[in-house]
């Protein structure tokens, strides 16, 4: 079987089974069903206002339902479980059945519809819509719609948060269709929002600001500490450079003095031919032969 036909077949089986349960369990307050296919078989959960009537005396009714489902719909090892609906006013199928029953008993359709809507909204529903169609008054068919609260009509939220129910009321003039749509109190609407109060905003805003302030102070302290360390290192480097420069200058002066002394000693010990010597203010000078000027003996002679 193709995938498309498989989906169509599954939908047909579920719709037919829902109609069968609604007909067989009308007195028990039938409120819908779920089908879950597992490796152990097919699990069918039936929701009802009176689950005891679904089970029956010694399980007689539920065994009969299981045999009929297996015979009519050819399911794999069907197992039926009955669950009680705690709040029938929030179950769309139950309210549709009640509305149809009220109309069949002779209630005016508008009164029955408003009473049903009032019960649904008093139970805490976010929205409710009731549509009654058929020969309401007169010989022509028409549609009567009643809406209260918030209702979605299209899109994915319709499948997620809107509960649908449908039932028929048989009158002398014809059949009336009763459709009920309910949005439960715990449903999350797609356009819902909530304003935060001042305390929540204060807690959300103050904490990051305080953290930023403390972080900023810590950063400033770290920067100042790094600056002080850098200044101290620079001062140590400058002092070391000055000390090295002074040491180099002293070494140069000592070397120059030693060279001068060595030159003087050399000059005193070596005397050239035709050279004249004299002492002026403690400085020895000499004059070479053939020259008319005197100069210190420690001066280097330029070779000619």
From Swiss-Prot:
Function: Binds the lower part of the 30S subunit head.
Molecular function (Gene Ontology), one example: structural constituent of ribosome
Record domain KH type-2: where: 17-86
Subunit structure: Part of the 30S ribosomal subunit.
UniProt key word Lyase: no
Originating species: Methanococcoides burtonii (strain DSM 6242 / NBRC 107633 / OCM 468 / ACE-M)
Protein family membership: Belongs to the universal ribosomal protein uS3 family.
Keywords noted in UniProt: Ribonucleoprotein, Ribosomal protein, RNA-binding, rRNA-binding
PROSITE patterns for this protein: KH_TYPE_2
Keyword Secreted: no
Residue ranges the record marks as coiled coil: none
One of the GO BP terms on file: translation
Superkingdom assignment: Archaea
Name the UniProt record assigns to this protein: Small ribosomal subunit protein uS3
One Pfam family here: KH_2
NCBIfam families for this protein: PRK04191.1 (NF003219), uS3_euk_arch (TIGR01008)
GO CC field: cytosolic small ribosomal subunit
Cited InterPro entries: KH_dom, KH_dom-like_a/b, KH_dom_type_2, KH_sf_prok-type, Ribosomal_S3_C_sf, Ribosomal_uS3_arc, Ribosomal_uS3_C, Ribosomal_uS3_euk/arc
């Amino acid at each position: 079987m193709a995938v498309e036909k498989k989906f169509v077949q599954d939908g047909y089986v579920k719709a037919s089974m829902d109609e069968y349960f609604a007909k067989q369990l009308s007195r028990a307050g039938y409120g819908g069903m779920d089908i879950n296919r597992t490796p152990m078989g097919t699990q069918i959960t039936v929701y009802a206002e009176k689950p005891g009537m679904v089970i029956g005396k010694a399980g007689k009714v539920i065994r009969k339902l299981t045999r009929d489902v297996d015979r009519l719909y050819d399911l794999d090892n069907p197992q039926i479980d009955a669950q009680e609906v705690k709040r029938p006013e929030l179950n769309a199928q139950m309210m549709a059945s009640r509305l149809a029953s009220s109309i069949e008993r002779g209630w005016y359709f508008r009164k029955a519809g408003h009473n049903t809507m009032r019960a649904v909204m008093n139970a805490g529903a976010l929205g409710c819509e009731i549509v009654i169609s058929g020969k309401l008054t007169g010989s022509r068919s028409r549609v009567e719609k009643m809406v209260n609260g918030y209702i979605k009509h299209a899109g994915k939220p319709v499948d997620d948060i809107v509960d649908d129910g449908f039932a028929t009321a048989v009158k002398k003039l014809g059949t009336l269709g009763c459709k009920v749509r309910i949005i439960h109190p715990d449903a999350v609407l797609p356009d819902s929002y909530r304003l935060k109060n001042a305390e929540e905003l204060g807690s959300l805003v103050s904490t990051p600001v305080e953290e930023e302030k403390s972080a900023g102070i810590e950063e400033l302290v770290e920067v100042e500490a790094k600056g002080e360390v850098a200044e101290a290192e620079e001062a140590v480097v400058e002092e070391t450079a000055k000390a090295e420069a002074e040491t180099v200058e002293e070494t140069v002066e000592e070397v120059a003095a030693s060279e001068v002394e060595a030159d003087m000693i050399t000059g005193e010990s070596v005397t050239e031919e035709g050279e004249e010597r004299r002492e002026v203010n403690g400085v020895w000078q000499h004059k070479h032969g053939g020259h008319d000027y005197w100069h210190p003996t420690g001066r280097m002679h330029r070779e000619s």
